[in-house]
């Protein structure tokens, strides 16, 4: 069980490093954030199953819903910036203010 958690922690760390490395491009950042959320989802689900905490089994589903909302908002920002400026650089997000 510990090697599985170690692999999930490594996947989270690699995705976090990816956010720091590819922070200029919105699409790469969104993919890394999605990887982070999925590794957190799997870790929480495994911890709850391992400890037989049946009263909190809804927590991973709530986390997955928030992850889907985050992905939807991120893709909407990606479409808006790519239609307006033709690129997915994050520094263009400051230009979207009213």
UniProtKB/Swiss-Prot annotation:
Its EC number is 7.1.1.2. It is an enzyme of class 7 (translocase). The chain crosses the membrane at residues 1-21, 29-49, 59-79. The keyword Membrane applies. GO terms for molecular function: NADH dehydrogenase (ubiquinone) activity. It is found in: Mitochondrion inner membrane. Keywords: Electron transport, Membrane, Mitochondrion, Mitochondrion inner membrane, NAD, Respiratory chain, Translocase, Transmembrane, Transmembrane helix, Transport, Ubiquinone. The keyword Transmembrane helix applies. It catalyses: a ubiquinone + NADH + 5 H(+)(in) = a ubiquinol + NAD(+) + 4 H(+)(out). GO terms for biological process: ATP synthesis coupled electron transport. GO terms for cellular component: mitochondrial inner membrane; respiratory chain complex I. Its main location: mitochondrion. It holds the Pfam family Oxidored_q2. It is a multi-pass membrane protein. Core subunit of respiratory chain NADH dehydrogenase (Complex I) which is composed of 45 different subunits. Core subunit of the mitochondrial membrane respiratory chain NADH dehydrogenase (Complex I) which catalyzes electron transfer from NADH through the respiratory chain, using ubiquinone as an electron acceptor. Part of the enzyme membrane arm which is embedded in the lipid bilayer and involved in proton translocation. PANTHER family: NADH-UBIQUINONE OXIDOREDUCTASE CHAIN 4L (PTHR11434:SF0), NADH-UBIQUINONE OXIDOREDUCTASE SUBUNIT ND4L (PTHR11434). Belongs to the complex I subunit 4L family. This is NADH-ubiquinone oxidoreductase chain 4L. The lineage of its organism: Eukaryota, Metazoa, Chordata, Craniata, Vertebrata. The gene is MT-ND4L.
